[in-house]
Amino acid sequence: MPKPLLEVHDLKKHFPVTRGIFSRTAGHVRAVDGVSLTLVEGETLGLVGESGCGKTTVGRTILRLIEATAGQVRFEGLDVFGLKRRELRTMRRRMQIIFQDPYSSLNPRMTVGGMISEAIRIHGLARGSGIRSRTAELLET
């Protein structure tokens, strides 16, 4: 069997519910409660469910855009929850979430080339004219 690319075990994300003038925690909303999955290279995973069931929260928690309440996530054998900021940034370049509504995921005021250029610049993959040439190269493929 191929080596797992992504392993998620018993992932949980609970959000506190606060009440009162002092914002006391009155309970928790269990947005994600015990998700486990394994993905090998070349596979594609689609999380499907009704609105509000936790699909986006699973993705954001795997990428550590929000912190998990409990569980384990391993990407290419590395413990994602144990990565330092710089290592996490490198890992995120290799992972992608495609949100369910492409109309709200893409900025209608930017061209596709502009979005690609922005990603290249943000991740420090090129500078100046290198950004333009790399963008053009990617648009040709």
Q: Where are these predicted regions, by residue range?
A:
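ABC transporter nucleotide-binding domains
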Residues: 1-141
